[in-house]
Amino acid sequence: MQFTSISNSLTSTAAIGLSFTTSTTTTATFTTNTTTTITSGFTVNQNQLLSRGFENLVPYTSTVSVVATPVMTYGHLEGLINEWNLELEDQEKYFLLQATQVNAWDHTLIENGEMIRILHGEVNKVKLDQKRLEQELDFILSQQQELEFLLTYLEESTRDQSGLHYLQDADEEHVEISTRSAEF
C-alpha cells in the first residue's frame, strides 16, 4: 500500500519587502523509509533593502528520515505463530520435566518427614527411658549408701561386742585355768 505525496507550500510577504518561504514535501510508503526535505529561507526585496547590505536569500535546509513499520503478510504472521507454538511446546516440556522433579522431591520430603516424625517419637521414648533409669540408679545409689552406713554401724557394733565377748571368754578361761590350778 502506498500513500500519495503531500506537498505544502507557505509564502508570506511583509510590507517592508521581507518574505518568508517554507516548502515541505512528504512522501510516505508503508514498506519503505520516508525522507522529508524542508527548505526554509528569507527573501528580501532588493529594491528596498539593497542599501543596507542584505543578500538576496538566506536558505536553510534540513533532512529528516522517518522509519515506517514494515507490512506483515499472512504467511509471515503464520510463520511467527508456528515459531511461538514450537517455543511454547518446548517450554511446556521443560515445565513438565521440572514439575515431575518437584513432585519427586515433594514425595521424598514427605517420606523423610514421616521418618523424622517416627524418629522424634522414638527419641522422646528413649529420653523418658533414660530419665526413668537415672531415677532408678539414683534410688539404688541411695539404698547402697544407706546399706553401707548400716553395715559400718553393724561392723562397729560387732567389734565392740566381739571385744567384750572376747574379754568375757578370756576371763572365763582365766577363771577356769585358775580353778584348775587351785585344784591341783
Swiss-Prot record:
Name under which the protein is recorded: Nucleoporin-62 C-terminal-like protein
Family annotation (InterPro entries): NSP1/NUP62, Nucleoporin_NSP1_C
Record-linked Pfam families: Nsp1_C (PF05064)
Domain of life: Eukaryota
Gene Ontology cellular component list: nuclear pore
This protein's UniProt keywords: Coiled coil, Protein transport, Transport
Coiled coil: 117-151
Gene designation: NUP62CL
One GO molecular-function entry: structural constituent of nuclear pore
